[in-house]
């Protein structure tokens, strides 16, 4: 029995150490991405595909580090999105102008910085910016995303360290 005890302890430590990783992977898998419209090679953007998506992120779900092969605008319409820029550039956070003119920049998220984006604000993501996001506040987050990506590129590309 005494010889088995160290093996049992090691096995338990491995299970405990990997449980958080497995839980995070399961939570990220619960994200719903509905492509509402898709248009390839729109006028003035040959070699690109334009998308309109509705992304629903369950409460407490973390989207791991990723980037996009093109620009995106994401309008948060429900909940609060905790958004972190890891590297690769700045992301502007804007709010609509009530007169329909140019949106007002309310914040610029620098690399290494996190900002909570509430419903009513939008993020403007340049291509290639590595970032992650999380639905915070105990509520789901719904974001409408307009993307202009390189033809054939996936909607997002996960970054592995």
Region roles according to the model:
Residues 47-52, 58, 68-71, 78, ...:
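Extracytoplasmic
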Residues 65, 83-84, 125, 131-137:
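Short beta-strand His + acidic residue motifs that chelate non-heme Fe in jelly-roll/DSBH
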Residues 45-46, 61-75, 92-95, 100:
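A short beta-loop-beta micro-motif enriched in histidine and acidic residues
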Residues 68, 85-87, 156-159:
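Short, solvent-exposed loop/turn and secondary-structure capping segments
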Residues 55-59, 81, 85-128:
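Short acidic-glycine-tyrosine-enriched beta hairpin
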Residues 138-154:
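A short hydrophobic beta-strand segment most commonly corresponding to one strand
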Residues 2-8, 14-54, 64, 98, ...:
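A short, N-terminal "cap"/entry segment at the start of jelly-roll beta-barrel domains
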Residues 75, 82, 144-147:
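Soluble periplasmic/extracytoplasmic beta-strand elements of cell-envelope proteins
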């Amino acid at each position: 029995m005494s010889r088995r005890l160290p093996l049992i302890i090691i096995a338990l430590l491995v299970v405990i150490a990997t449980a958080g990783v497995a839980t995070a992977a399961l939570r990220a898998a619960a994200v719903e991405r509905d492509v509402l419209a898709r248009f390839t090679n729109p006028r003035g953007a040959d070699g690109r595909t334009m998308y309109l998506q509705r992304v629903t992120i369950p409460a407490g779900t973390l989207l791991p580090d990723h980037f996009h092969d093109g620009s995106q605008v994401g309008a948060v319409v429900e909940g609060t999105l905790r958004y972190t820029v890891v590297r690769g550039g700045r992301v502007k956070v804007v709010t609509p102008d009530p007169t329909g003119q140019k949106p007002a920049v309310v914040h610029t998220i620098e690399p290494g910085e996190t900002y909570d984006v509430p419903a009513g604000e939008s993020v403007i993501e340049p291509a290639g910016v590595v970032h992650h996001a999380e639905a915070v506040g105990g509520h789901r987050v719904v974001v409408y995303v307009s993307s202009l990506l390189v033809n054939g590129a996936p909607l997002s590309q996960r970054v592995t360290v």
